[in-house]
Amino acid sequence: VNTIVSGSPAIAAVAAMLIVLLVGDFASTFFYHVPQHVWGKLHLRTHHDRRRSYWDHAVLSRDPAVLLDGVLGAVPYLVIAALCAKLSLGGALLGLALGQLHVWWRHTTELGWTTPAWFVRIARGLQIVLPEDHDGHHRNPEIEFGDIFRFYDAPARTLIVTLRAWTPKRKRVPVRRTVALKRRAAVKPTS
């Protein structure tokens, strides 16, 4: 790649930016986000807590656990950006900036944001995660994986199922969850 783009700083910058976004999202999804959903508690406790506003939580919070979750999710992007800085420092920094802007944007549904239909069509074509998609992930942590790109969702779900099947402790969790739901349904509220 470097020999192709070495003659053009603009092409090098675009290449570095795209690598940071695509490879960073892949690494963050499969090396942090998916393992947290299978084995971890930090991400589930901080990012999927229904008692909290996820706009305040993801964007404004100063809670150390929330910040740690955010930093750990960003580490793959930072590593890729450091490697891409040799190709184009400006492109690597632009990739990080666009990634951070996307973090803020994808948490705006709670503020009343609705993505315009024309932009939905463009984003769907580019497989970009919309705020409405990410809102679905907050409401149901089993769907809509991929920080920036939707094409990581299906492989992430497949990997989660595989890892849960290989984890002996986790095999009983769906059974316990089903039993608990049946108990709740069987207990009728009294007025």
What residue spans do the PLM features occupy?
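Primarily interfacial, aromatic-capped hydrophobic alpha-helices that serve as membrane anchors
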Residues: R164-S191
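Membrane-embedded catalytic scaffold of the fatty acid hydroxylase/desaturase
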Residues: L18-R172
